[in-house]
């Protein structure tokens, strides 16, 4: 779905007026256009298609990409949450380019979202596209809706995980993944 640029610009102007700001003052004049460009950039990731390689030889060990920086917006307050994603999978017959894992995170992060759903969507997408022996996704994030408002606790991080296949069923595999993302620095 594309963005209704004019409707979004009008809405941002109305929002600024509603909170007592002058949308025509210096510093805010271009804000509606900036917001439109931000959301157009975010929406551009929705159409990402995963490139998959099926000739992987005999490789059947864990593939891990950790510390993938991500940004999203809490769907309850429209405030940012951001942090790091750690992703692993064990190939069955398919692999993807490592940068594609970053794009998968962005595909689901760049929208109003909750961290729990984001974690599950990443894992489910990789399961569907790669048919691996297992997928592990851990997200660590600071939520500005907790840091700036409400409890005002800027030192807390939310950690969510989604494990499938070998990562869920085999404690040794799960522990190897957790060790790699926490101690392998």
UniProtKB/Swiss-Prot annotation:
<feature type="binding site">
    <location>
        <position position="74"/>
    </location>
    <ligand>
        <name>Zn(2+)</name>
    </ligand>
</feature>
<dbReference type="GO" id="GO:0008270">
    <property type="term" value="F:zinc ion binding"/>
</dbReference>
<dbReference type="Pfam" id="PF01227">
    <property type="entry name" value="GTP_cyclohydroI"/>
</dbReference>
<comment type="subunit">
    <text>Homomer.</text>
</comment>
<keyword id="KW-0547">Nucleotide-binding</keyword>
<dbReference type="GO" id="GO:0003934">
    <property type="term" value="F:GTP cyclohydrolase I activity"/>
</dbReference>
<protein>
    <recommendedName>
        <fullName>GTP cyclohydrolase 1</fullName>
        <ecNumber>3.5.4.16</ecNumber>
    </recommendedName>
</protein>
<keyword id="KW-0479">Metal-binding</keyword>
<dbReference type="GO" id="GO:0046654">
    <property type="term" value="P:tetrahydrofolate biosynthetic process"/>
</dbReference>
<dbReference type="InterPro" id="IPR043134">
    <property type="entry name" value="GTP-CH-I_N"/>
</dbReference>
<dbReference type="InterPro" id="IPR043133">
    <property type="entry name" value="GTP-CH-I_C/QueF"/>
</dbReference>
<feature type="binding site">
    <location>
        <position position="77"/>
    </location>
    <ligand>
        <name>Zn(2+)</name>
    </ligand>
</feature>
<feature type="binding site">
    <location>
        <position position="145"/>
    </location>
    <ligand>
        <name>Zn(2+)</name>
    </ligand>
</feature>
<dbReference type="InterPro" id="IPR001474">
    <property type="entry name" value="GTP_CycHdrlase_I"/>
</dbReference>
<dbReference type="GO" id="GO:0005525">
    <property type="term" value="F:GTP binding"/>
</dbReference>
<comment type="similarity">
    <text>Belongs to the GTP cyclohydrolase I family.</text>
</comment>
<dbReference type="GO" id="GO:0005737">
    <property type="term" value="C:cytoplasm"/>
</dbReference>
<dbReference type="InterPro" id="IPR020602">
    <property type="entry name" value="GTP_CycHdrlase_I_dom"/>
</dbReference>
<dbReference type="GO" id="GO:0006730">
    <property type="term" value="P:one-carbon metabolic process"/>
</dbReference>
<keyword id="KW-0862">Zinc</keyword>
<dbReference type="InterPro" id="IPR018234">
    <property type="entry name" value="GTP_CycHdrlase_I_CS"/>
</dbReference>
<comment type="pathway">
    <text>Cofactor biosynthesis; 7,8-dihydroneopterin triphosphate biosynthesis; 7,8-dihydroneopterin triphosphate from GTP: step 1/1.</text>
</comment>
<keyword id="KW-0378">Hydrolase</keyword>
<keyword id="KW-0342">GTP-binding</keyword>
<keyword id="KW-0554">One-carbon metabolism</keyword>
<dbReference type="GO" id="GO:0006729">
    <property type="term" value="P:tetrahydrobiopterin biosynthetic process"/>
</dbReference>
């Amino acid at each position: 779905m594309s963005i209704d640029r004019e409707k979004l610009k009008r809405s941002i102007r109305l929002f600024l007026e509603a909170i007592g700001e002058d949308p025509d003052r210096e510093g805010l004049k271009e804000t509606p256009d900036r917001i439109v460009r931000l959301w157009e950039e975010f929406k551009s990731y929705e159409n990402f298609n995963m490139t998959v390689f099926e000739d992987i030889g005999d490789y059947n060990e864990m593939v891990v990409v950790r510390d993938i920086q991500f940004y999203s917006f809490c769907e309850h307050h429209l405030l940012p949450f951001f942090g790091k994603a750690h992703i692993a999978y064990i190939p069955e017959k398919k692999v993807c380019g490592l940068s594609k894992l970053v794009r998968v995170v962005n595909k689901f992060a760049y929208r109003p979202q909750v961290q729990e759903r984001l974690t599950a969507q990443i894992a489910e997408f990789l399961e569907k596209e790669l048919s691996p022996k297992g997928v592990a996704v851990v997200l660590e994030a600071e939520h500005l809706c907790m840091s700036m408002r409400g409890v005002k606790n800027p030192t807390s991080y939310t950690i969510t995980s989604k494990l499938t296949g070998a990562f869920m069923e085999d404690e040794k595999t799960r522990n190897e993944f957790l060790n790699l993302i926490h101690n392998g620095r």
